[in-house]
Amino acid sequence: MVSPGLDLELSFSQALQGFGFSPEVARLLWLPLPMLLVLVAAVVGVLVSVWLERKISAAVQQRIGPEYAGALGVLQPLADGLKLLVKEDIIPARADSLLFTLGPVLVVVPVIISWLIIPFGQNLLISNVGVGIFLWISFSSIQPIGLLMSGYASNNKYSLLGGLRAAAQSISYEIPLALAVLAIVMMTNSLSTVDIVGQQTGAGILSWNIWRQPVGFLIFWICALAECERLPFDLPEAEEELVAGYQTEYAGMKFALFYLAGYINLVLSAVLVSVLYLGGWGFPIPVEWLAGWLNQPIDAPLVQVITGTVGIVMTVLKAYLLVFVAILLRWTTPRVRIDQLLDLGWKFLLPLSLVNLLVTAALKLAFPVAFGG
């Protein structure tokens, strides 16, 4: 049995009503909070990821890395952000200023909005719309438009080539990514991220989808790295060929938005892998045992707080383990050529994801208990 955990909206409403606010006013005050929580979670995730990348990269190269900005350099990402914030915002003379400004916004906004459907507990998510996976795929398809727009509007050959590469890469890897997720949806009979995690809670770690979908897991992770433009798939901004790709003409906060979107997307992809394949917030011990040890009913506030906290910690730990793997891959794999990138997507991952989907359908019919019949 899974504890219902914390209900953010209900808890917030009850707290305000305790101070004398009416339910209508409490509801009105709740409305702006989800996006604020999403922004805070995304920014904190980026700051932690940037610091980890700097320190892990330094360790791989036998360097110390940042150490002066705060203890162990933990304030270095914040210092970098402040530096970009005060830099001059330059628009090239022959650039399309409207599209040049709109491009970075179209890149970062869909990634931030995608956090709305990420669950950290049974009720510990911003928006349980029931079709969270569909929404995430829809939002992710907007990003290539912003990348191509940025490259085109810069009026620079390197920027345009980088934008075209980014769009081609994103389109090539979105299809096998969606097919890998479709196999999970088929087993769960739901597009809800909450239902997908709930389906993995029956037998602890043995219930995780990674054991039933090992091929789908690998397809999803490879495609996620390509969508995030991480090595070995960072062709849109290959320094030796394209200066900085679609980012070449950008400076200041517009450049920072690309930087921000890349790391938010990396953390988002890692959290989604945790949710889809690694049991999400899955509690390491039965909730009934915890409630009995605390001598509390299973729906007691204390039990809910503990299970909610542990659920968040479990989800974040699994996600940052994958971020650690992505950072190591940056320094241990060479960049692929553009023809190799497209061949991998269209000639290998796409057929493999189709076969994986068909095999999952067959196993669902043959073994309905194990594969969600």
Swiss-Prot record:
The chain crosses the membrane at residues 28-48, 98-118, 129-149, 177-197, 205-225, 267-287, 309-329, 348-368. It is found in: Cellular thylakoid membrane. Pfam families: NADHdh. It catalyses: a plastoquinone + NADH + (n+1) H(+)(in) = a plastoquinol + NAD(+) + n H(+)(out); a plastoquinone + NADPH + (n+1) H(+)(in) = a plastoquinol + NADP(+) + n H(+)(out). Disulfide bonds: none annotated. Belongs to the complex I subunit 1 family. This is NAD(P)H-quinone oxidoreductase subunit 1. It comes from Synechococcus sp. (strain CC9605).
